[in-house]
Structures are given as C-alpha cells and as structure tokens.
A protein has these predicted regions:
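Accessory beta-strand-rich segments of carbohydrate-active enzymes
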Residues: 3-5, 9-18, 30-38, 53, ...
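Short Gly/aromatic-enriched secondary-structure transition segments
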Residues: 21-29
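Short amphipathic alpha-helical segments, especially helix-boundary/capping motifs
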Residues: 39-43
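Surface-exposed, low-complexity/disordered Ser/Thr/Gly/Pro/Asn-rich loops and linkers
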Residues: 44-54
Length: 145
C-alpha cells in the first residue's frame, strides 16, 4: 500500500536581500508571480516592466512551510520526496537536514527522507541559488581565457 502527502499550496518565500520579510507564494509556482501578487513588483509582462524586475534574478530565494506527518507514514520502510521542475540550483532541507540537491530543472528528483521526518509537525525548506550567479561562478572556474 502506498501513501502520499501533497505539499503543494501556500508556502513562505524569502529573498536573500530581505532581512526577515516573507511573502506568501504558491507551489507549484514561481517567484515573479508571488512578487506580483504581493505588490512587490509591477507586472513584468506589461510594457517595459521586465527591465524593472531584473535584479530579482540575482537573488537567492527560500521557500518554506510546515507540514504534518502522520505517525503511520513512518511505519513504511521508505518515505520518498519527489521533486519535479525545480529551477535550477536548489537544496532541500527537512527539519534542518539536507535531503536533496537539485541542479537541473528537467530532472525528476527522488530521495528517501524518512530519517529526516518525525511524527507531527515538520518543516521543509527549498533554498534556491541564483542561476545567473552560479553560472558566472562555473564560467570563472573554466581554464579558458
């Protein structure tokens, strides 16, 4: 018998450039939709507004939320987290323990997270690194002029 928990819905979103401020964000979803809904940016699809939101691609981002795990779920030999369309460089933590690293939006990831879970309340965080900044770091490490 299989069991699953759906973690889609409202999460908290925080930028590396903000102190303690968070905004609500839906997953599946994206940063720009959350920023627009929170009134933090103009509509990037209107006029030349895209130019006004370029800075946000250089931020690191963190999605987080709490979720409950029924004790029965921990009776299974394995408890897997499946992540799809994670764009792009991200680390997933459950209760502060790293359970998954992602580097490719087009890869489906699966990790056994049972050891990180506890019955009752749990916290999951997805920490995204700026793809632009990570690409620049990788390019600088290449042996080419």
């Amino acid at each position: 018998m299989a069991c699953s928990l759906d973690l889609s819905g409202v999460w908290s979103l925080k930028s590396s450039e903000w102190k303690e401020e968070t905004i609500p964000a839906n997953l599946p979803g994206d940063n720009y939709s959350a920023l627009l809904a929170a009134g933090k940016i103009p509509d990037p699809h209107y006029g030349r507004n895209e130019l006004a939101v370029q800075e946000f691609r250089r931020h690191d981002w963190e999605y987080s939320r709490d979720f409950d795990v029924p004790a029965e779920l921990l009776g299974y030999e394995h408890v897997y987290l499946t992540a799809e369309m994670v764009d792009t460089f991200a680390t997933v933590l459950i209760n502060g323990k790293k359970v998954l690293s992602c580097e490719n939006m087009f890869t489906r990831y699966r990790a056994d997270v049972k050891a990180a879970l506890r019955a009752g309340s749990n916290r999951i965080e997805i920490r995204f690194k700026s793809a632009e900044n990570e690409a620049k770091k990788a390019a600088a490490e290449q042996p080419f002029p």
